[in-house]
């Protein structure tokens, strides 16, 4: 950043360089905090793990050290197979309900790869109608819609491709699974 750069940007594009740089830096700081919180949640998640394959009719049984892969032998479309992911999500949601005694999962965070599968499942409702003028853009995690009117779906481009984080967010502060409370906040 130089004074000349700021003057040129203002003269040619009518933009305030300081405001633009501050905005970008704020977004990056916000992204870092979001990723730190998501990492904390992924490491603390205790409802369990389910294994699922995107390959049609392929079952993976997680038996600890290594999974057993088997072909199921029934035939369906790829879209119908993608719907079986919903069963796995619901199973973990019910475990969360058992553990919290408050409710099942009501949000999920996934990678864009898993997001593509979820967006193709009947029951997914996108938050945007595709109008770029109405859309809001930011770095990192974005709410993209809901699944079956039950789960808010967030896409995280930095998330491991084959993982989904499910969580329950209650209506009160004490109904949360984690609290991010840094002793010295960023000024």
Q: Where do the protein language model's features map onto the residues?
A:
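Compositionally biased, intrinsically disordered low-complexity regions
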Residues: 50, 55-56, 66-69, 75, ...
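Alpha-helical scaffold segments that mediate packing/assembly in large oligomeric complexes
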Residues: 1-3, 14-91
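Conserved P-loop NTPase motor cores
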Residues: 77-78, 101-106, 110, 119
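Structured binding elements
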Residues: 96
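Acidic/polar loop patches that form or flank catalytic/metal-binding clefts of enzymes
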Residues: 34-38, 105-107, 117
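Sequence/fold signature of self-assembling virion shell proteins
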Residues: 1-4, 10-13, 17-19, 23, ...
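Beta-sheet entry/capping signal
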Residues: 27, 104-108, 151-152, 163
């Amino acid at each position: 950043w130089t004074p000349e750069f700021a003057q040129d940007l203002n003269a040619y594009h009518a933009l305030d360089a300081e405001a633009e740089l501050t905005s970008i830096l704020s977004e990056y700081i916000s992204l870092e905090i979001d990723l730190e919180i998501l990492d904390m949640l992924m490491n603390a998640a205790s409802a369990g793990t389910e294994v699922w394959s995107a390959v049609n009719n392929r079952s993976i049984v997680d038996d600890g050290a290594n999974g057993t892969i088997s072909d199921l032998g029934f035939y369906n479309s790829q879209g119908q197979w993608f719907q079986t992911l919903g069963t796995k999500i619901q199973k973990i949601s019910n475990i969360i309900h058992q553990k919290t005694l408050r409710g099942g999962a009501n949000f999920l965070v996934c990678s864009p790869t898993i997001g593509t599968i979820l967006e193709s499942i009947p029951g997914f409702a996108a938050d945007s109608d595709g109008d770029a003028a109405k859309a809001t853009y930011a770095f990192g995690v974005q709410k993209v819609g809901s699944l079956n009117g039950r789960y808010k779906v967030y896409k995280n481009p930095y998330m491991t491709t084959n993982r989904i984080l499910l969580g329950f967010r209650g209506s009160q502060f004490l109904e949360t699974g984690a609290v991010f409370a840094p002793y010295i906040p960023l000024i």
